[in-house]
């Protein structure tokens, strides 16, 4: 899911061509080299990563994947390789509207989350009265925030901070408690 910097994203190489970059592709290459295997990375939307793992059509999935217990029926997980967190993001100009998580729960708010992500559950849990808008790419969530179509969004902290650094009109307004703080590699069940 190459819209999830710093986990995975496209960077422009010295020839002006987009190249997959980030710490997930770097870790995947390291693991493949260590095991003496050939690595093939297939970029896809996040919800596609989950579906392909569940169907067994890929060997592993690396997409800032949280080892959520609800996913355990469909896949196995590596140990956590990155400890992170969850955040609520909004426009800097609207940060005062969100002093705490309870303030995100208003029917007049549109709150974004990435389809298939744990952030959907966080939105449903913390902002159940809001209009929860599911989008397949984090880049679409960011565009909707900046364009004023979303009031806020639930995004993994490292990703939220990366976007806020590149788009100063954005603000990481709140830390969001979550029991599973970190990322692991999703592996085909029983593999």
Which residue ranges define each predicted feature?
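Extracytoplasmic
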Residues: 2, 22-23, 34-36, 48, ...
């Amino acid at each position: 899911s190459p819209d999830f910097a710093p986990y995975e994203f496209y960077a422009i190489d010295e020839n002006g061509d987009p190249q997959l970059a980030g710490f997930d592709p770097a870790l995947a290459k390291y693991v493949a080299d260590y095991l003496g295997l050939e690595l093939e990375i297939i970029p896809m939307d996040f919800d596609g990563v989950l579906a392909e793992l569940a169907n067994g059509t890929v060997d592993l999935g690396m997409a800032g994947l949280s080892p959520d217990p609800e996913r355990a029926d469909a896949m196995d997980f590596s140990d956590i390789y990155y400890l992170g967190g969850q955040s609520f993001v909004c426009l800097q100009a609207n940060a005062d509207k969100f002093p705490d998580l309870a303030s995100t729960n208003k029917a007049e708010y549109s709150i974004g989350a990435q389809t298939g992500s744990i952030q959907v559950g966080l939105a449903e849990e913390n902002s159940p009265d809001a209009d929860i808008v599911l989008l397949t790419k984090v880049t679409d969530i960011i565009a909707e925030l900046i364009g004023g179509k979303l009031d806020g969004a639930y995004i993994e902290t490292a990703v939220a901070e990366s976007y806020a650094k590149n788009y100063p009109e954005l603000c990481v307004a709140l830390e969001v408690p979550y029991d599973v703080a970190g990322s692991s590699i999703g592996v085909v069940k029983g593999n």
